[in-house]
Amino acid sequence: MISPLRSWILCVLLFFAAALCFLDRQVLSVLAPQIIAEFGMSNTSYSRVVTAFVLSYTLMLVFGGRVMDALGTRRGLALSVGFWSLASAAHAFVTGPLSLGLARFFLGAGEGPAIPGAIKGAVEWMDPKRRGIAVGLATSGASLGSMIAPPLVVWIALHLGWRGAFAATAALGAIWLMAWLLAFRGLPAAATTPAANRPTSSWRALLARSEVRRLLAARFCFDPVY
């Protein structure tokens, strides 16, 4: 079992993982005018770069839960953050639209499992009575990342250039990864693994519930705007 204190520490780390996820993806959006001008990109070329991220992110967002189930949240999130941080760092070395698109594709692939993993971790490691606030805390980091991205990225770019901005945000991911591994230090893997006999529900049973269908419809309408 995980102590209550360690459970909250892990939830705070999940919060920062979500924040970094939404911070890293917005670096390009903030710096796009400068990068487009430097590489002489057209609107069509830039749209392809954006699509590369959206495509891989969408695919891995769908299958991210499977990844977390297969690897476990402990290792799965470490792999996710480590992978997207490397992809973010790769942005600092791109030489044109093609390499930029590849970096965006791998960034999306790494970030896709992050939110499913954050929700899964909050549910697994928190007492049932506090799971609601734990999930809310873990996922609200996305709003923080979106909010601080523009001023932070502009400030870094003014001092280090646009390539330095990508490298700096990648470094934040490396710091998070070290903190994540330290948080599990001395904790047996079995302590973070939920019981195998936990009741499960089929997709058919879930979709048969009207509240689930309404929630899916609401998210379908809301998420593209968000």
Set out the residue ranges of the language-model regions:
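Residue-level signature of mid-helix packing/kink "hotspots" within the transmembrane helices
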Residues: 26, 54-62, 146-147
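Short hydrophobic/alpha-helical segments at membrane-entry points of transmembrane helices
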Residues: 98-104, 214-215
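Extracytoplasmic
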Residues: 9-43
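Helix-loop-helix hairpin linking two adjacent transmembrane segments in secondary transporters
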Residues: 138-182
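Membrane-interface helix termini in secondary transporters
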Residues: 34, 65-66, 155
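Conserved MFS/SLC helix-loop-helix module at the cytosolic interface between two early adjacent transmembrane helices
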Residues: 59-98
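Juxtamembrane intracellular "pre-TM" segments in multi-pass secondary transporters
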Residues: 2-3, 188-216
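Cytoplasmic helix-loop-helix junction between adjacent transmembrane helices
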Residues: 103-142
